[in-house]
């Protein structure tokens, strides 16, 4: 039951890591679904069909990997000792799941046969230990492939010491090579909660081959102390092996020493896993055990496997080991969590610049919102508490001050102890705010006077309320008497302007003569957007009463306000809901920017005034074009004329970019005056009057030679002389 739970948890961890590597991990539901399919013994084709919706193009790759791991688990035995070792080697983050390793039970079994001899090193420089492993890449058919001659892979984790080493100690730095392919199935270690702690690896060189002693926290303790070991020491006084063991006893950390055995024995070793998938109650126990084991030390394994086909490399290492003499062994520290590698390809990863920009903008927005406290529409200055604005309240508090002075004893002493730092901090804040708001020096002196006046009062009451600086748009509360002598004169003005009620205090007012107290208004200084607090709204709505403009308000500092602003204030007090402010703003905008005339600018679109032009500039296209009857006076956009300035058509409906030169107007065509009467002129065709009102027929161009019988034009008739003219008479002669 325990072993099956552990194995199923490991498989689930590996599945989750693989999904994260493929970029398909969203939540815990997909690993749960895959575990159910594994428990139901789904085939690879069935898993590919079911998971294609979630994994897409990576489905075949994932199912091949998963079934390779499951086939590996089915092919091994169910020996409990080998189960735990194979569990470590298959699912550990430091070696791939398909590497050939050895179990810790077999390590202990062969420990007596090959006892390592402690050989110290006299070389002060740092060395790099060549840890050779036979790596296989998991394929669809689980075919094991060995690397080329001399190719050795190194462990993924970067090894660095857990403590400062003496100059005579050797530090072995084990880093991955660029050509390593051992990260295929190891990305799930990044999410493994058991890989959060570090392990200590001590290297002891034997007479013939180097062996690695690995310290782990198992269930039983190995008390073999024949070798000289350098362990992790949490206190500087514990420098010996005995002190390190005492520390292990106190902190309940148990270590186990494992050594490499002979290569012939290594070749015969096989580790097995037998998956057990039970009921839902067992799955619940898996989750509980997972939560419980997160607090346990990491169980990891560092394996060194020699490739015995290369005799030259072995002899070289033997010679190197033989040249090391001394009694100091090398201490290697392995950080359990490897450097995180991104599970997505670089093309699909989020842009880091966008993330950094979003973080910076979020921080800026947070700082901007926190600078304005809760009342975001007002700018606060920590100068003095708010004051009452009616003379009656002031006189009542001054009269009551004599009887209440004995009540201020211990608070004053406590405040005086912190007075220096508080005053200094308030002064700094005041200077910063004054410089930021660019307040007039006279107003700054006024604020300083008010600060001095209320120093004792703020200590007495421990009042944290702030002096309110307001824009004239809000309630401008104008202020108190310049002295008690002139107090009665300004009391009427205060009472007239006391529409804004201030929260009353029942604590003591100091017995001091009245000093000038002012409220500075920020005219033209921008204020952060926001709205009045609930307290301000209540005070404005409940305490507003119609205010009359006092005649004496222009005397003293009250006269600093512009008369127009005073009228605005009195009208605003009568209108607490803010509708007056909107009307005022609209009036100001009208005064500043006159309304445009509904007449098209004759210089558009070449008008140089732009938006400041008093005439209309068309924006949207005309829907009635080309049948628009307004032509160039239309308030909408017409297409440009291709003749532009050379266009001579006076009523051209197109838009002319350049100004047209006014051409000469065409001469009006005078139509011939119709005849006043259709009566034929009696003198025709001999009429010689040019303005003859009678009808004169038009002559035929062919005159007497016209042969058309139906010719409508006039043909002159040939006149025959009268008859008496044709009679010949013999002239009379005298005989």
Curated annotation (Swiss-Prot):
SMART domains documented for this protein: ZnF_C3H1 (SM00356)
Gene Ontology biological process terms from the UniProt entry: mRNA stabilization; regulation of mRNA stability; spermatogenesis
Residues carrying N-acetylmethionine: 1
ZnF segments: C3H1-type: 595-620, 621-640, 641-656, 681-698, 700-718
Gene Ontology terms for molecular function: poly(A) binding; pre-mRNA binding; zinc ion binding
Keywords: Acetylation, Differentiation, Isopeptide bond, Metal-binding, Nucleus, Phosphoprotein, Repeat, RNA-binding, Spermatogenesis, Ubl conjugation, Zinc, Zinc-finger
Record carries keyword Nucleotidyltransferase: no
Signal peptide location: none
A single GO cellular-component term on record: nuclear speck
Annotated region (Disordered), positions in chain: 79-141, 307-351, 366-388, 400-430
Principal location class: nucleus
Subcellular location per the Swiss-Prot or TrEMBL entry: Nucleus speckle
Modified residues (Phosphoserine): 85, 240, 309, 327, 343, 390, 409, 421, 498, 515, 527, 620
Biased amino acid composition, Basic and acidic residues: 412-426
Pfam families in the cross-refs: zf-CCCH_2
InterPro entries: Nab2/ZC3H14 (IPR040366), Znf_CCCH (IPR000571)
Modified positions (N6-acetyllysine) in chain numbering: 357
PROSITE patterns hit by this protein: ZF_C3H1
Bias kind Polar residues: ranges: 79-103, 131-141, 366-380
Keyword Cell membrane: no
Function: RNA-binding protein involved in the biogenesis of circular RNAs (circRNAs), which are produced by back-splicing circularization of pre-mRNAs. Acts by binding to both exon-intron boundary and 3'-UTR of pre-mRNAs to promote circRNA biogenesis through dimerization and the association with the spliceosome. Required for spermatogenesis via involvement in circRNA biogenesis. Regulates the pre-mRNA processing of ATP5MC1; preventing its degradation. Also binds the poly(A) tail of mRNAs; controlling poly(A) length in neuronal cells.
Family, as annotated: Belongs to the ZC3H14 family.
Protein name in the entry: Zinc finger CCCH domain-containing protein 14
Organism expressing this protein natively: Bos taurus (Bovine)
Gene: ZC3H14
